[in-house]
Amino acid sequence: MKKSLIALALILCMLLCTCGANEVATAESTEAGSIKETTPDYSNALILADQGMFSSGGTVTDPVEGTYDSTTNWLDATRAGNTAHVDHANVLYQIPAGETGNPMVFLHGYGQSRMGWMTTPDGRDGWSNIFLKKGHGVFLVDQPRRGEAGSTVTMTEDGFLDAWAADSKDYKPGDQAWYTHFRIGRVAPERYKGSQFPEGEESQNQFFRQMTPNTGSLDMAVAAEAMNAVLQDVYEMTGKKSVFVTHSQGGAIGWNVDVKNMAAIVAIEPGGTPAVGSEQYQNLLAANIPIVIYFGDYIDNGPEDIMSTGFWKGIRDGAVAFAEQYNADGGDCIVVNLPDEGITGNSHFMFQELNNQQIADHIGAWMAERGLE
């Protein structure tokens, strides 16, 4: 019995010592942790004064034939008597604290949404963040029938759109076609020598998953009308005209947008330029809109056996001819061939590539020269 009591006493002593040691260790680690803790450095943090979303433009459809029955409502697949708000643009905006420059409105190209401006395939800052840090409010558009502006007239033409019907539109795969046509590499996943496109399987995965289809037919006039409303809404919000940044197919839309609320156009490899003497050309010239048009690499030095190489040469040659005449008529237009500036390795998606900050700085300098910084 005595031995048992002694053994029990020893066990209790050991437990108490262990607890004490743990408490001391915890205290020391807590104390050490508090010593190591420092106030986070927010000196370079991006601080927003405001952000939000809104829709601009669009129409309301005529009611579907028949009378709306509130008792069956959603279960009535004919949608009789229903209307739909359609063919608008959707805008996500962010305003930096201490905003100094003109607002910038970004319009994506074909198969993309505003996401392309907001990030990169490898997760770095996209141009929206970069230009926010330069003091510009950014307004990121999803054009009609794309992304978060997907509502379109096809929703009511047949009463109720059945996504599983036999006659539904098929999505056409295009990963490899995109990759080649937009000069990332000859065949995915290989990249051209010196490419600025982010390397690695996951970067390519993230890039391809940005692509999104139209929900209805592509209608340039509908898109341009919605963009007129966007620029008007931005002007009413900010009291300033916008620097209108377009890409690819968005560039083709951009030339048809009303110039009254534009401060300048930055076109990234636009899908063509206005014909000299056309109504679009004359409107831009009369409003004295400064224009800069950017082209990347692998155009002069792209594979000659790939049709897209000749395509991009033609697009760029057209832009150069446009700029020459625009300037001769008293306008201000510059075509920037990035390799001529010592900036190499860029594809059609230069705003997502490893040197996107450098190109944004180049645009920023052009804007500053025109009082738009």
For each feature predicted by the language model, list its residue ranges.
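N-terminal cap/lid segment of alpha/beta-hydrolase-fold proteins
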Residues: 33-99
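Conserved alpha/beta-hydrolase
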Residues: 124-149
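Gly/Ala-rich beta-loop-alpha elbow adjacent to hydrolase catalytic centers
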Residues: 245-254
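Catalytic active-site module of serine/aspartate enzymes centered on a nucleophile-bearing elbow/loop
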Residues: 345, 349-373
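Short beta-strand element of the alpha/beta-hydrolase
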Residues: 101-109
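Active-site glycine-rich loops that stabilize anionic/oxyanionic intermediates
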Residues: 108-120, 271
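Conserved acidic catalytic loop of the alpha/beta-hydrolase fold
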Residues: 221-242
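The feature captures the conserved acid-bearing segment of alpha/beta-hydrolase catalytic domains
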Residues: 267-338
